[in-house]
Amino acid sequence: ANDAYASYWNPAGLAYQEGSELAFMHVNWLPNLADDMYYEFLGYRKSFPNLGTIGGHLIYLNLGEQVRMDEYAQYQGKFTSYMMAGAISYSQKINETSSFGLNAKLSYQHLVELGTGSEKGKGTSIDFGFDVGYMKKGWLLPTLDLGITMTNIGPKVSFIDPDQADPQPTNLTFGFA
């Protein structure tokens, strides 16, 4: 990405941008499945000559209203699930054709008010993680750029029971443009 969305896709891409920019997106997510699910993104970046580029983004995903049932399939009411995350980004050129970037992220997930079945507690989590990115301009061909990112690096995500924690969905991505 060569705009404020770079903090999401590959923070290393921020290094090649000048000035400042604000970006916003709203998407009705999976509208054929449910009409109350949506995704929102707000991103910002500003370059500082000889220092690099800072930026960040906020993400909100509303998973809509859901029906709560107990372990005997008895109706218990309705609830709404949502997730939000914020990231602070920094990117710097290594030289004229290479750059690196880093995101520090904090996320909050609200899946349900209470535990399910015999579980006690709330179905929420607060977690942190990091993304790292690298970009190489003119890789193999003058007009071919290479991007590499590793996202969601951090500790396990735990809701009610830390013994049932799950790893963050860490991804290694390669891209060409």
Ranges and model annotations:
Residues A1-A177:
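Subset of outer-membrane beta-barrel
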